[in-house]
Regions:
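ATP-binding N-lobe of GHMP and related small-molecule kinases
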Residues: 3, 14-126, 130-150, 164, ...
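C-terminal nucleotide
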Residues: 14-28, 51-88, 98-99, 184-302
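Generic recognition of stable, solvent-exposed alpha-helical segments in well-folded globular domains
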Residues: 127, 131, 152, 170, ...
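Short, well-structured alpha-helical segments that form the helix of a local strand-helix-strand
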Residues: 150-162, 288-296
Length: 302
């Protein structure tokens, strides 16, 4: 949603644009934590959103007000924006877009608000970044092209959130919030996303009020699984997580600790569960009871 306001002065025509962008959070239906490992995921947008609204200024100051968390941020459009804190996403988005040909000659007054639970695993940070990038692509003084697709916004968000800071995460959060709906994502060999126009039942999202331990999860799930893959490839160089039959995992039991073997079984099970669900989504022949069973199996293995 956007609006255009034109102000005339005796000396020149000055155009100020007011822009309002909103982006949904997401839940992962199938493949949770597997995008870290190059496997596909299926995610769904939720009805909780982040809103970014604002207008251009006459100078190069950017002021961002975040009343929900009683915070604000101010910086200026210098030629090379330096990061002053971890995950400095407001600046990284501008740097990424500039490298792709976007030009920003004026600053902005911006307000951010939303109702996605923070640090709860529903992609509040990615939804914020996607909204901010979408806002910036509209507000740029010069653009490499007239329109930008939702997929491209997702790609920019991956660059600004993950690649720019060397983060170990995957691509699900950025693409699922940028694309919305129910989305299937493959990250290898190159990002590819499909949107499924299927209707599922209602989901109830509960907030435990306990912060998500992102680094702890990554240490166990991603790096733990990468260690397992390294062990198995030394035993069998042909091993590939994407194709290895789950029923053959037993032959590696003696090569792994009990915890490693359980993690391997869980990843193989989650991979195959996603494939079954994907088949239903692609044909739009949804068996709600079976979807529920698959969701339960998936959650049990996490």
């Amino acid at each position: 949603m956007w609006g255009l306001v034109v102000f005339l002065t005796p000396q020149y025509l000055s155009v100020f644009i007011f822009m309002h962008i909103s982006t949904p959070g997401r839940i992962c239906l199938f493949g949770e934590h597997q995008d870290y490992l190059g496997l596909p995921v299926i995610a769904a947008a939720i009805s909780r959103r982040i809103h970014v609204q604002g207008e251009a200024r006459s100078d190069q100051k950017i002021h961002i007000n975040m009343p929900d968390i009683q915070s604000e941020e101010t910086f200026f459009l210098e030629p090379d924006l330096k990061y002053t804190r971890a995950r400095d996403y407001f600046k990284s988005a501008i740097n990424v877009l500039r490298r792709d040909g976007y030009v920003f000659d004026r600053g902005f007054d911006v307000e951010v608000h939303g109702n996605i639970p923070i640090n709860s695993g529903t992609s509040s940070s990615s939804a914020l970044l996607v909204s901010w990038i979408h806002f910036l692509t509209h507000m740029a003084t010069e653009k490499p092209k007239d329109t930008v697709t939702q997929f491209e916004i997702g790609r920019y968000a991956v660059a600004a959130e993950v690649l720019e800071f060397g983060e170990p995460g995957g691509m699900m959060d950025q693409f699922s919030t940028a694309l919305g709906n129910i989305m299937y994502l493959e990250s290898l060999p190159a990002p590819m996303a499909l949107s499924y126009p299927v209707k599922l039942g209602k989901f109830v999202l509960g907030d435990s009020l306990e912060p998500k331990d992102t680094l702890g999860i990554l240490k166990h799930v991603k790096f733990g699984m990468l260690d397992i893959i390294d062990i198995l490839k030394k035993k069998d160089p042909s091993f590939e997580l994407s194709t290895f039959p789950a029923q053959e995992a037993e032959r590696f039991r003696s090569d792994l600790t009990a915890e490693q073997y359980k993690l391997l079984q869980g990843n193989l099970s989650d991979r195959d569960i996603l494939r079954e669900a994907k088949g239903m989504f692609e044909t739009n022949q949804i068996d709600n009871q079976r979807i529920g069973e698959l969701l339960n199996i998936h959650q049990d293995s996490l």
